[in-house]
């Protein structure tokens, strides 16, 4: 049997880049909660003892940016300098201006356009992907790497492993076979975890706890065998982490946010962007389209691309490829997609309820992936049943 290896990585919520994504989306949540028409393009950067938020926001909401920054960092677990950042004593810098009036008139006509008329906030192309290899219809490498990261945070916060600190990275290599275009996982080849820890714990204790409390509950036993390789904190020491260890920026983890290197990516990041930014809303709707194709039994694996021009409502192109796994021709699947999904930005906002913020709605997306999540707030994960015409 001919097989191949494929690898996906993840980082958990204490990684400095992910801290920035969460701050940007916490600010988006706060704006949309009070004013669903908020136009938000919020970037965050961080380094030792400092978090800065900057960008363009036009909103009627009253938002305490500094409080949101501190609350978000504290919620992650950055409560003292020795864990990488002290949420209550770090410097918070804010440099936020209004959205450019040139962009405003072209995209939403200074809020005068009807939903079906609202143009894309920028040019770009986005991809959605789905595969039948997991119940989530997501790649197994990505699902396992992401769940390992989430479990690391869980056992840190519930004190199962009190030596854990917020920063951490995971990576999973899976051996696959190609079944006429569909991906079939055979086994987990390698598991890599690098996690921040306190000064007191030994490397043996780290390895033992990670195997028992993180790997065992996450990776199904059927995928592990005596040949599975484990690299657990292979550098030997990871005490300094978070923004103290390295700088962080919003939008630096776009593959972790999506499909772990499978499918394709148009390059646009998600966090800190309101739904007129098609980098986000366009990527969400093509995930729904690709997932619906696979869930409806029309293909075992599917990728969908959409593209836009700034200020233009209708997409420039829509593309689908089922990697030769389709039960009907791709051209017929494309017709079904165009009939069932409205790719105009204003209509995506309505159909996926994307103008609703608050209650951590977008902040939740900013760690552990935007896709394959079982949460009603992730409206783009709802399957539309696609029926080919008789």
UniProtKB/Swiss-Prot annotation:
- One GO BP annotation here? S-adenosylmethionine biosynthetic process
Question: CDD domains, per this entry?
Answer: S-AdoMet_synt (cd18079)
EC assignment: 2.5.1.6
List positions binding ATP.
Answer: 15, 167-169, 235-238, 246, 252-253, 269, 273, 277
| Keyword check for ATP-binding | yes
Record-annotated residues binding Mg(2+)? 9
Give Gene Ontology CC terms: cytosol
Pathway membership of this protein?
Answer: Amino-acid biosynthesis; S-adenosyl-L-methionine biosynthesis; S-adenosyl-L-methionine from L-methionine: step 1/1
Reaction(s) catalysed by this chain's protein: L-methionine + ATP + H2O = S-adenosyl-L-methionine + phosphate + diphosphate
- Induction (free text): By salt stress, ABA, and mannitol in roots. Repressed in leaves by the same treatments.
Cofactor stoichiometry and binding? Answer: Binds 2 divalent ions per subunit. The metal ions interact primarily with the substrate. Can utilize magnesium, manganese or cobalt (in vitro).
Q: Which Gene Ontology terms cover its molecular function?
A: ATP binding; metal ion binding; methionine adenosyltransferase activity
Q: Where in the cell is it found?
A: Cytoplasm
- Binding-site list for K(+): 43
Alphabetical UniProt keywords: ATP-binding, Cobalt, Cytoplasm, Magnesium, Metal-binding, Nucleotide-binding, One-carbon metabolism, Potassium, Transferase
The answer to whether UniProt assigns keyword Metal-binding to this entry is: yes
Task: Tell me its cofactors.
Answer: Mn(2+); Mg(2+); Co(2+); K(+)
- Let me know which tissues express this protein, per UniProt: Mostly expressed in stems and leaves.
Q: How does this protein assemble?
A: Homotetramer.
Under the heading PANTHER family, the entry gives: S-ADENOSYLMETHIONINE SYNTHETASE
NCBIfam families (UniProt xref): metK
Q: Mind telling me which HAMAP family this protein's record contains?
A: S_AdoMet_synth1 (MF_00086)
Query: What does it do?
Result: Catalyzes the formation of S-adenosylmethionine from methionine and ATP. The reaction comprises two steps that are both catalyzed by the same enzyme: formation of S-adenosylmethionine (AdoMet) and triphosphate, and subsequent hydrolysis of the triphosphate.
The similarity comment for this entry is: Belongs to the AdoMet synthase family.
Q: Report what the protein is called.
A: S-adenosylmethionine synthase 3
| Organism of provenance | Solanum lycopersicum (Tomato)
Q: What is the lineage of its organism?
A: Eukaryota, Viridiplantae, Streptophyta, Embryophyta, Tracheophyta
